[in-house]
Amino acid sequence: MSRTVIIGSRDSQLALVQTHWVRDELQRAHPDIRFEIVEMKTQGDKILDVALAKIGDKGLFTKELESAMLEKRTDLAVHSLKDLPTALPPGLILGAITEREDPSDAVIVRRGLEAAGLADLPEGAVVGTSSLRRLAQLKHHYGERLRFQDIRGNLNTRLRKLDEGRYDAIVLAVAGMRRLGWSERISEVLSPDISLHAVGQGALGIECREADGEILDLLTVLNHPPTARRCRAERAMLRALEGGCQVPIGVYTELDDSGRLTLQGIVASLDGRNMARACRSGPGDAPEALGRAVAEDLKAAGAQAILDQIFVLVRSPGVIAPGAAPAS
C-alpha cells in the first residue's frame, strides 16, 4: 500500500506518548508507508470544571476522534482502551488491542508527607480521584479515615495539584505513570483485594473503519492475543451491564498457560457499602461468552439495583458522590 496513513490522537502528553509508540511500531513493521499523527481535543479534554460522572457521556474522550475517521480525515485512532465505549459507532471497529501494561491503580502521595500508601495517611487526609470506581472501592476500605475529592485534568495537571498541597494523595493508573516515565512517583500499587481495575485499563485500543481492510491488515502487528482475550471478556461484561466508563464497575482477569480465562467483576454503590461480586472461569477462546455470564451473575447478586440508583444520583443536580466534592 503506497500512501500516507493518518493517525488520530488526543493532544495530552500521555495520549501522544501512546500514539507515538503506535506510530513507531507501525513504521517499523511497514517501512514503505508513511504514518502521520493528527492531534485533537475531545469533549473530556475541554470540560474540566465538572466531574466526569456528571457529564454522563460514554464517548467523552473518543467522539471527535471517531468523527474524523468516519469523515475520512484520519484512518485510525489510538485510545486508552478504558476510555473507549463498548458500543462503537456504525462503521467503526476495534482493530487491535495492544499488549497490556500493569492494569493496577497507583497511589501517589504528596512529597514531604511520610506515608507509604493509603493505610499510612493521617486521619482526615484528602485523596483525589476522578473515578467513581476507585472512589467506591476506596470508601469501602478507607471511608472511615480518609476524605475523597474529585480531581480533573491530565496527569501533569493532577500531579501539579498534588504537589501544590491541594491533596495528600491521588490515585491514578500505573500504566499512565509508567508510560510517562514517572514510576518513581508511585508510592503504592493497589492490589485487587483493594481496588479492581477498570475495563481495558493498561491496554491501548486501535480503532479504525470496519470496511478498511488495508488498515485492518496493517494493525495485526499491534494486536496481542492474550491481552485481547482478557479485554474482550471485560468489555463484554461491561456491555451486558450497560455501564459506561464512569460507573463503579471493576474487573480483574487472568489467563493461565492452558488458555483458561478467569474474570472477576464487581459493581459497587457510591458509598462503598454495597458490592455485588462475581467470578467465573472459561475457555480463553470464548471471552465474550464469559463476560456475559459474569454480568448475569452480577445482576443476580444485586448489581442492577446498585446501577439504577447510581444513574439517578449522578444525574441529580449538585450530586457527585457521597463524601466527594469538587477540588477547589
UniProtKB/Swiss-Prot annotation:
InterPro entries: HemC (IPR000860), Porphobilin_deaminase_cofac_BS (IPR022419), Porphobilin_deaminase_N (IPR022417), Porphobilinogen_deaminase_C (IPR022418), Porphobilinogen_deaminase_C_sf (IPR036803). Its EC number is 2.5.1.61. One of its GO terms (molecular function) is hydroxymethylbilane synthase activity. Tetrapolymerization of the monopyrrole PBG into the hydroxymethylbilane pre-uroporphyrinogen in several discrete steps. The modification S-(dipyrrolylmethanemethyl)cysteine is found at C245. Keywords: Chlorophyll biosynthesis, Porphyrin biosynthesis, Transferase. Pathway: Porphyrin-containing compound metabolism; protoporphyrin-IX biosynthesis; coproporphyrinogen-III from 5-aminolevulinate: step 2/4; Porphyrin-containing compound metabolism; chlorophyll biosynthesis. Its cofactor is dipyrromethane. This is Porphobilinogen deaminase. The keyword Transmembrane does not apply. One of its GO terms (biological process) is protoporphyrinogen IX biosynthetic process. GO terms for cellular component: cytoplasm. Pfam families: Porphobil_deam (PF01379), Porphobil_deamC (PF03900). CDD domains: PBP2_HuPBGD_like (cd13645). Belongs to the HMBS family. It comes from the Bacteria. Binds 1 dipyrromethane group covalently. It catalyses: 4 porphobilinogen + H2O = hydroxymethylbilane + 4 NH4(+).
